[in-house]
Amino acid sequence: MGAVLFATSCSLDQDPISDFSEITVGGKDTTDTSVKFKTKEEMKTQYDGIYKAIQNAQEAWYADMLVLNETHSDNAYCGSSGAELTSLEQQTQDGTNKNIERDWNAFLGYINTANRVINNVDLVPDQSLTQAERKQWKAEAKIWRAWILFDMVRLWGDVPVVTEEAPDITAENVEEVYPLLYPSRKPVAEVYAQIISDLNAALKPGGAPAVNAGNKFLLTKSVANALLARVYAEKPVRDYAKVIQYAEAVQNDGFKLVPDFSDLFSVNDAKTDVNFRNTSESIFEVTYPVGSGNWVTWMFGIDHVDPNSTYNWAKWITPSRDLIQAYENEGDNVRMNQAIVWGQPSWSNHYPSDHYPFMYKTRSKYNSIIKIRLADILLLKAEAYVETGNLQAAAALVNTVR
């Protein structure tokens, strides 16, 4: 999403960062107040907290992001007729929109989960936490922080760049601590500088882990390279040579397009699980295996592995007529049938109720939320080739994805 959304229309409630600074595990060392986590186990809880936050970010970092991206690109209607969603679709939102406030606060909270690791992992006195683990955990946390800052700057333009944890406020330190509790917004250029710094730091030797074919729910070097390709394609002064450079770095990590597009989303015939996780095309996906499951699937339609699931309210992200027409114009039934499913709900907000389209990719509670896949990066690289005049190379990449 290249355009900055809501930058001028909203006056957001910048809740104090201390709201997100509660340390639930560990405590202050009586001999060194700078040490919050004294054991490897305590620090591991904070590291694991990053991935738990990602799994739990289904509302702000997935459903809401889809609303903001897809309705503004005319790929979808918001679906529900609630005032918050309708104003977002119509771009008439203001500072009273609770969804925006919710996402703003959530994103600052995600950044704080990263900062807990970044700022504390090197201070843990427990030597069973190895230097290799410290470097890797910090690198993964920096990728997470950079990713959230990237989404924030694209949505809101100038945003706070929070890299420190706020200490407890007292009468003696109020002037020093106040800017940490109520951070001011930084110019877009400064935000992008922090994003690039974090991602480059994560790519240093001994930093982020290499790709793991059996676990794509991992903030790897490939994720950092993919994000850098996106960053250089969307920052105010774009650098398409770097887009190509980082896209090629992703390709060199061995990802492959899946032979069957349905492999990314399909469930098995028994409807007891998805057919595949961690495909060769996936770069980063949030997994929800049997025994856990996501809840966000029912925001878009029914849960196709649950026979009791019903269309009980007007769902989010209704595919638009423009999107459906685009598929039909290309004769692309393969992708359309994996992206859109038709149902018969009780409402007719955008279509007749006897033939109503719903988003289909996240079709069950067992489906992963695929945040980055190879096709995204190949098409981004193709765009960079177009911008640099290499139309033949761009066409070859587009045809590969097709």
Predicted regions and their residues:
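Short coil/linker segments at helix-helix boundaries
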Residues: R134, D158-A189, A193
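Extended ligand-binding clefts on enzyme/binding-domain cores
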Residues: N252-H355
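Conserved, well-structured interaction surfaces
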Residues: D32-V35, T39, K44-D48, K52-N56, ...
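Short, surface-exposed recognition loops and adjoining beta-strand edges that mediate ligand/DNA contacts
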Residues: W61-G82, V159-E172, A208-F300
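Membrane-proximal, proline-rich intrinsically disordered regions
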Residues: C10-V67, A247
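Flexible, polar/acidic helix-loop-strand segments at domain edges
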Residues: S87-Q90, E165, I169-T170, P319-L374, ...
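Sec-dependent bacterial lipoprotein signal peptides
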Residues: M1-T8
